[in-house]
Design a protein with these regions (language model features):
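Active-site loop/oxyanion-hole signature of alpha/beta-hydrolase fold enzymes
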Residues: 7-39, 55-56, 79-83
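Gly/Ala-rich beta-loop-alpha elbow adjacent to hydrolase catalytic centers
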Residues: 41-46, 50
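Flexible "cap/lid" loop of the alpha/beta hydrolase fold
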Residues: 55-56, 60-103, 107, 137-138, ...
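Conserved alpha/beta-hydrolase catalytic His-Asp/Glu region
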Residues: 100-151
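Post-His helix in hydrolase/transferase enzymes
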Residues: 193-208
């Protein structure tokens, strides 16, 4: 199940009103309505969202899967780690919008920065659906405890050709915050488009692990 987080996709929350707190609350509300435990997958920046959700609902989450995602320790922010990722391709193409506390990525970098191993129609689709990203969550420190967050097993899927969240920073993160298992894919930042079958097989493998 993939959901539209606040301000994203079909969710019409004004982007200036989107906060990390409301995003995590939406995830928690969703899993509260599902019988039994769930496995949460976070991609890219949304790694911070599933981490914070695990802190609030550890009893409802069976496993956490970080897909080329920000895996940030307690008290740190996503922005601190993205600043360390000097090899990423996206930063020169980011435009800040202070009036809405958001930023956008210039379409010129979509193909080479996000989808270089994907079909051309994926890039064209992205031009239609990618929009402003809220800034606030990137500067919000995570509040995680050993009792809650660290009680949920973590798995990492490293994208070896990622130009958005580079392999360098991915390895820094899963080294500093160890996971039960790390999988590697020879893909860009978007393996759900370039190698969906291989990604699905990894998801299934993680789901079956005890």
């Amino acid at each position: 199940m993939a959901i539209d987080l606040p301000g994203m996709g079909r969710d019409k929350t004004p982007i200036q009103d989107v906060k990390m707190k409301s995003t995590v609350e939406k995830i928690c509300q969703l899993i509260d309505g599902i019988e039994g435990k769930v496995i949460l997958v976070g991609h890219s920046k949304n790694g911070i969202m599933i981490s914070q959700a695990a802190e609030y609902r550890p009893q409802k989450i069976e496993k956490l899967i970080y897909l080329a995602a920000y895996l940030i320790p307690n008290g740190k922010t996503q922005r601190e780690y993205s600043a360390r990722d000097e090899g990423g391709w996206l930063k020169p193409y980011v435009t800040q919008h202070p009036e809405t506390n958001s930023h956008t990525l210039h379409p010129d970098i979509y193909k080479q920065g996000l989808y270089h191993d994907c079909d051309e129609d994926i890039t064209e689709m992205a031009k239609c659906i990618l929009s402003n990203e809220p800034v606030e969550s990137g500067f919000t420190p995570l509040h995680l405890t050993n009792k809650n967050f660290n009680s949920v097993p973590r798995y990492y899927i490293e994208c070896m050709e990622d130009r958005a969240v580079t392999p360098f920073i991915q390895r820094v993160m899963y080294t500093e915050t160890p996971c039960k298992k790390v999988y590697c894919m020879n893909t860009s930042h978007s393996p759900f488009f370039s190698k969906p079958k291989e990604l699905t097989e990894i998801f299934c493998d993680i789901a079956e692990l005890q």
